[in-house]
């Protein structure tokens, strides 16, 4: 379902069988209401525009058209909604089935700075207690870099050159 949103839009979900729509139906309106791209995707989009602008200067014949640039903006919003759908559906299912301590492991994108799934969990279960752990990469390991502060309650600090998988 998130893939359908990322390559198309939220309307793509309405074409899913009714049985599938039960999984995301409760959060669909919330996701549809998102009008601003997530800063993570906005940053990626801005980098693409910068590369495009430099490319435009060196190869004007291959420059992105205004239509292509608008499509890039729309794609950024679709990606934001797709990630929001994942977070909202995960949160809805956790909130509906939570009976005790629950450990949910996911990538930083989904929980850093109290965003992503945490936003939805707090909406669906306002009294929920959440503790987050975030992995950060930095050169100096003895002290948390100020840019990493506020991402989580606890940190796993690794050297910048640590191999990463996505």
Question: Where do the protein language model's features map onto the residues?
Answer:
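A substrate-binding/cap region within the structured catalytic cores of diverse enzymes
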Residues: 1-97
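C-terminal regions of proteins
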Residues: 80, 85-103, 109-166
């Amino acid at each position: 379902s998130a893939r359908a949103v990322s390559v198309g839009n939220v309307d793509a979900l309405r074409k899913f069988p009714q049985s599938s729509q039960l999984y995301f139906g409760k959060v669909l309106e919330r996701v549809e209401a998102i009008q601003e791209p997530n800063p993570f995707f906005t940053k990626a989009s801005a980098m693409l525009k910068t590369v495009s602008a430099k490319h435009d200067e060196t190869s004007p014949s291959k420059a992105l058209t205004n239509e292509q640039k608008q499509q890039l903006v729309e794609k950024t919003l679709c990606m934001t909604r797709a990630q929001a759908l994942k977070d909202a559906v995960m949160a809805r299912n956790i909130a509906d089935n939570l009976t005790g301590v629950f450990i949910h492991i996911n990538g930083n994108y989904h929980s850093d700075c109290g965003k992503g799934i945490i936003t939805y969990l707090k909406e669906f279960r306002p009294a929920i207690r959440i503790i987050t752990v975030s992995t950060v990469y930095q050169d100096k390991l003895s002290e948390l870099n100020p840019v990493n502060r506020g991402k989580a309650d606890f940190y796993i600090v690794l050297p910048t050159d640590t191999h990463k998988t996505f």
